[in-house]
Amino acid sequence: MSSNQEPLVEGKIKDKHSETHGFEVDVNQMMDTMIKSVYSSKELFLRELVSNSSDACDKLKALYFQLREKGCVLDPVTSLGIEIIPNKDNRTLTIKDNGIGMTKPDLMNFIGTIASSGTKKFREEMKEKGNSADASNLIGQFGLGFYSSYLVAERVDLITKHPSDEALVWTSTGRDVYTIEEYDGEPFAHGTSLVLYIKEGEEEFLDPKRISEIVKKYSLFVFYPIYTYVEKEIEEPEEKKDEEKEDEKVEEETAEPRVEEVREKRLKKVTEREQINVEKPLWKRNIKEVPEEELKSFYKTVSGDWDDFLAVDFWHIEGLLSIELLMFIPKRARFDMFNKNKKNNNIKLYCKNVFVTDDFGDAIPEWMSFVSGVVASDDIPMNISREMIQGTNVMKLVKKTLPQKIFEMIGKLALDAEKYKTFYKEFGNCLKMAIGEASEGQQDGYAKCLRYFTTKSGEEAISLDTYVERMAPNQKQIYVITGLSKEQVKSNPALDAFQKYEVIYMHEVMDEVMLRGLKKYKGHTIQRITSEGVELPEDEASNEEVVKSFEEFCKKVKDILSSKVEKVTVNPRLVSVPAVISTTKYSLSGTMENIMKSQPVTEANPFAAMTAVSKKIFEMNPNHQLVKNLKALFDSNEIEKMNRILEVFFETVLIHNGFVLSDPKGFCANVFDFLCSEEVRCEEPVEEVQ
């Protein structure tokens, strides 16, 4: 645009001769584009058509007494239902209901007019009459669900009858025309039968097993019963001839044993009607009044677990949206619970009893992968295909609320000691993951669910609250020891200096992960006894002279060990062990060093290998004879001899403290050389063996 050209402003230009035109529509192209682009999967057609049938039944139910007063002949409300009838011979799939049916204007306005929703209009009419509760369960809203038929059908016949009108047949191939004619088949009171003529290549939708699978996935909790027809083989009873009956009568009279001839079983094929959606939406009921067996059956259906659940709870949440949460904790962990490649789909979202998604993204944290259940709402804003949620309010509400509710559930479970033992054995690591990721404000509430064995707990694991209650006078820290097995932590030489105090055993990888986030509990610092920063209640002034007397010796040991250690000191609190290895305050712990070194990426990456090394503190026991001997060598300036002993001593202490040696072959060579040295040589000469 040139600098002197005036911009076009709305309303600036008026043309007295302007013409108004309607948009022209290429119906064939639009239908094809709409059908293929709206739905991500062809199987969704069945969800849409079942939902339409459910709405039709709801409408009849809402208008039942009005229609009766008008003299309409109606099926009993209790008989309302949906049938899905596959016919492989005719290549047809029929979805049939005995709901409200449609009049000719309905067919033209809502089937013949794209994106015009009869259900939406019905809902609005009921709301105007003050009967919105009667329409609260209606699913449809966009007026497009019917056209999903053409995902799998080349032609659709819609046979329908409104209670106050004649039966009609609507037919179309999904192109630019449709026909409506009177139905002259078998009479029926009301309802709709949708006959789909299945396309080539879509035969899977004629398989009763596939039909059942799709219905269970999307429409399992639709209020009305959904039936399909299944072909089965049953044993055909064999009619006995008169002479055989006579023989049996004679044998009964003689009562003599006889050998019966084994006859080949004759099987015949029969077609039986089976209900697919046996389970009911339990979140619509008071969970305390639901029988245990019904809850167990529901749990197995939504979770896919073969065993019963350990705990169940229900919450109704009111916020920007109204949602129900029905959650279950299983008895045992799935073998693939922490498999990063497997999507966590144990919690499912339902809107008006129809499945929407099991993908909550980051709204459901990884640690909750053991929980199964349902998030349900009747007022979730949906996108046009009803596969995704519009906006973020639902996910925000789930993300904020659900983890807190699960920990409430776990807290209730902890009141039953035996059940909680089962839970903690299976899912304790999930709790630790949650605590490590939680904010500081949440951590205390979550961490009270932890249970640990300690140096003084005996056979019963205790909570952190119990530990704090039992802390020594003036003890400010919670003492913990970490490792990779029970045996390793129980035998760690660092415990030698803590015989007066209770120390918590943490022997799982997830403990290390948790401690990276959990620094305090109820104001008490959580302190590894193998890390720098330990504060003991006792007065350490009496040890100052001992420490001072070893200062020069410690400097020399540091010079000899060089980069292998960050610091060398003496620890007068040690009792029976000659030395321990601890780590500096902000370094990796010894356990984390071992974990990182065991990872394949560390072996292949020199930089990763370099960072997977903790900064070590060599703490020697000044009262141990071995340390006294080394100091005596230092004092007498026998440095070479001291070096040789110190090298073996240090690496032995590393092993004793659970570290993995970087050069085990070199260590063995040093030990063998030491064993052959003068220090351990026999005084009497040994005769050479011939």
Curated annotation (Swiss-Prot):
GO molecular function list: ATP binding; ATP hydrolysis activity; ATP-dependent protein folding chaperone; unfolded protein binding
Record keywords, A-Z: ATP-binding, Chaperone, Cytoplasm, Nucleotide-binding, Stress response
Subunit structure: Homodimer.
Localization annotation: Cytoplasm
Region (Disordered): 235-257
Family: Belongs to the heat shock protein 90 family.
Motif (TPR repeat-binding): 686-690
GO cellular component: cytoplasm
Name by which UniProt lists this protein: Heat shock protein 90
Residues involved in ATP binding: N52, D97, F146, R386
CDD domains in the record: HATPase_Hsp90-like
Matching NCBIfam families: PRK05218.1
Acidic residues: bias regions: 244-254
Domain notes: The TPR repeat-binding motif mediates interaction with TPR repeat-containing proteins.
Function according to Swiss-Prot or TrEMBL: Molecular chaperone that promotes the maturation, structural maintenance and proper regulation of specific target proteins involved in cell cycle control and signal transduction. Undergoes a functional cycle that is linked to its ATPase activity. The nucleotide-free form of the dimer is found in an open conformation in which the N-termini are not dimerized and the complex is ready for client protein binding.
